[in-house]
Amino acid sequence: MIQQESRLRVADNTGAREILCIRVLGGSTRRFAGIGDVIVATVKEATPGGNVKAGDIVKAVIVRAKKETRRPDGSYIRFDENAAVLIRNDNEPRGTRIFGPVARELRDKKFMKIVSLAPEVL
């Protein structure tokens, strides 16, 4: 469960290391975001020479969350960290590589490029 001021690790090679959520997209009263939801964030920590710099405003999709997510078969999935992948306005990833596993829920939310780039889909 991600909300405003939540910090997330970036799971791609855009050059950002950590982002801070400043808005959950999907309505003015929407407070929380889970796996597969899109947020607006600011880059808090970045590697030198990357595509994004610290202070940039970016859109990101959540690929891993500590809060468990219930699946239709009754099972739950949760991860050890909160992580996101930076995306462009057309919902395509900005980076060319994805690090770490991603949740299967991204396939249902039409983020097929992220699913295909990920090394493991849980």
From Swiss-Prot:
It comes from the Bacteria. The keyword Ribonucleoprotein applies. Keywords: Ribonucleoprotein, Ribosomal protein, RNA-binding, rRNA-binding. One of its GO terms (biological process) is translation. GO terms for molecular function: large ribosomal subunit rRNA binding; structural constituent of ribosome. SUPFAM superfamilies: Ribosomal protein L14. InterPro entries: Ribosomal_uL14, Ribosomal_uL14_bac-type, Ribosomal_uL14_CS, Ribosomal_uL14_sf. Transmembrane segments: none annotated. GO terms for cellular component: cytosolic large ribosomal subunit. SMART domains: Ribosomal_L14 (SM01374). PANTHER family: 50S/60S RIBOSOMAL PROTEIN L14/L23, LARGE RIBOSOMAL SUBUNIT PROTEIN UL14M. Part of the 50S ribosomal subunit. Forms a cluster with proteins L3 and L19. In the 70S ribosome, L14 and L19 interact and together make contacts with the 16S rRNA in bridges B5 and B8. HAMAP family: Ribosomal_uL14 (MF_01367). Belongs to the universal ribosomal protein uL14 family. Binds to 23S rRNA. Forms part of two intersubunit bridges in the 70S ribosome. This is Large ribosomal subunit protein uL14.
